[in-house]
């Protein structure tokens, strides 16, 4: 049995242990705000290469670890990474984002999708996760991540990022049987992918349903929640002790429903006050978040004040400190350092109420 002190701090919190301070990491903590990342990107301009070449992905994942020592190290990857293994090719065009051509629009295309075999199509993921575990040891928790079915379907059906999601919503409201079939196939594939990440070394896995906040609560219950539950249920059948986190951008309208997904931790965006989020989700649900990424453009005193306010509102236990979205491009690295340093001193700066 591994002793508590041999278990990484974030993993202990994710399992429900009461600690002196909330663990801390940042979504997109490896990325364009860091000069070392930009230098590497200039040398290797293809995002697919940076995220699928193990040596590059490992190096990028470890850049913020070396700079700031976060309590979580998340593998550098993309939510679309498993799609080619299902028969959905994609590319990522710098400054434009993902492109899927041809997009998935017909029943025949959905029927022709193949089950995901990550050993065959995603072997680099094993190398990345195993290496990260080896590099950070028990000093940090290694996180994996996946896209949730609605968001992956939105990319695949729209063919690119979208502002209004008219094409997938058109399918949802005029040909729902095609969409439900597609969502179920994605859910099965993502459950396999999460299990694979855990088997390869991920200690916590975050599900990103980034675009589910674009759904009305009624449609969220029809097209997003059941497939989140399908993924979580299948993962928990085989890996019941691995904590799962769910993040949705613009989640204020569906926050309680996120708690119904079966995940262990709900990642709250900054549009909800953390005290209110705690009340709406109930004290038994652990939370993550939820500093506005824009706060990191403020003064360091302002950053510290916002961190203390959020931690105070979250209360003691069951909280992982994070942003309410990814780090923004152009964020000063010194302010990111201030964020992490303050977070690690929270217990001294603040008597956290029970």
From Swiss-Prot:
Its main location: cytoplasm. The record marks 78 as: Transition state stabilizer. One of its GO terms (molecular function) is uroporphyrinogen decarboxylase activity. One of its GO terms (biological process) is protoporphyrinogen IX biosynthetic process. InterPro entries: UROD/MetE-like_sf (IPR038071), Uroporphyrinogen_deCO2ase_HemE (IPR006361), Uroporphyrinogen_deCOase (IPR000257). Pathway: Porphyrin-containing compound metabolism; protoporphyrin-IX biosynthesis; coproporphyrinogen-III from 5-aminolevulinate: step 4/4. Keywords: Cytoplasm, Decarboxylase, Lyase, Porphyrin biosynthesis. Catalyzes the decarboxylation of four acetate groups of uroporphyrinogen-III to yield coproporphyrinogen-III. Homodimer. NCBIfam families: hemE. This is Uroporphyrinogen decarboxylase. It comes from Crocosphaera subtropica (strain ATCC 51142 / BH68) (Cyanothece sp. (strain ATCC 51142)). The gene is hemE.
């Amino acid at each position: 049995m591994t002793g508590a002190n041999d278990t990484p701090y974030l993993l202990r919190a994710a399992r429900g242990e009461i600690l002196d301070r909330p663990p801390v990491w940042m979504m997109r903590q490896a990325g364009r705000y860091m000069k070392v990342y930009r230098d590497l990107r200039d040398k290797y301009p293809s995002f697919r290469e940076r995220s699928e070449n193990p040596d590059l992905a490992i190096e990028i994942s470890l850049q913020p670890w070396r700079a700031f020592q976060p309590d979580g190290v998340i593998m550098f990857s993309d939510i679309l990474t498993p799609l080619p293994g299902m028969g959905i090719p994609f590319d990522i065009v710098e400054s434009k984002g993902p492109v899927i051509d041809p997009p998935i629009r017909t029943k025949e295309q959905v029927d022709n999708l193949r089950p995901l075999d990550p050993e065959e199509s995603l072997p680099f993921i094993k190398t990345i996760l195993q290496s990260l575990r080896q590099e950070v040891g028990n000093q940090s928790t290694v996180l994996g991540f996946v896209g949730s079915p609605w968001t992956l379907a939105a990319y695949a059906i729209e063919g690119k990022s979208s502002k209004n999601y008219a094409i997938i919503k058109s399918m949802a409201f005029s040909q729902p049987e095609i969409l439900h079939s597609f969502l179920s196939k994605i859910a099965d594939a993502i459950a396999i992918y999460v299990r694979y990440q855990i088997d390869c070394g991920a200690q916590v896995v975050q599900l990103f349903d980034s675009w589910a906040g674009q759904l009305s609560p009624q449609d969220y219950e029809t097209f997003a929640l059941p497939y989140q539950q399908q993924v979580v249920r299948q993962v928990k059948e085989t890996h019941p002790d691995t904590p799962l986190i769910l993040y949705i951008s613009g989640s204020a309208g569906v926050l309680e429903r996120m708690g119904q997904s079966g995940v262990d931790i709900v990642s709250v965006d900054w549009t909800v006050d953390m005290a209110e989020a705690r009340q709406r989700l109930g004290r038994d649900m652990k939370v993550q978040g939820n500093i506005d990424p824009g706060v990191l453009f403020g003064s360091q005193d302002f950053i510290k004040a916002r961190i203390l306010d959020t931690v105070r509102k979250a209360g003691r236990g069951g909280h992982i400190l994070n942003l309410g979205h990814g780090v923004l491009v152009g964020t000063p690295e010194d302010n990111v350092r201030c964020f992490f340093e303050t977070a690690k001193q929270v217990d001294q700066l603040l008597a956290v109420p029970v």
